[in-house]
Structure formats: structure tokens, C-alpha cells
């Protein structure tokens, strides 16, 4: 996770249905999807784009769960 960087708050207000659907999407996107969708030539502070995408997805899942949207 991005412990060495300043975090950027991203305020987002969603209707309940969109938040539920987004949490389902976040649950279903896997590491293999990040591998397939990322560039192998892009790096962020020495980390591959795939790994940064995967980390961001985990942060999104945690934020959704904290807001009460944690699909099984």
C-alpha cells in the first residue's frame, strides 16, 4: 500500500444502488485483470502499474466496506 506517499482524498457520493454495484465490481476484479489491463512499461515510484492498480483496488474495497458495502 502507499505508505510512503501523501494520500489524496477523493470525495465521492453515490446512490445506494451504484455503491452496491461498485462494491460487487471491486469484489470481482482480480489480480489477473490488473495484469491484463495494465501497461508493463509504466511504473509508479518503482512499482509496476499492475501492483499499484491492485493496491488501489484493495483501498477501494476497504473504503466501501467501511461505508457498509462489503459483498460476500
For every predicted segment, state its role.
Residues 1-16, 20-72:
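Positively charged, low-complexity terminal tracts
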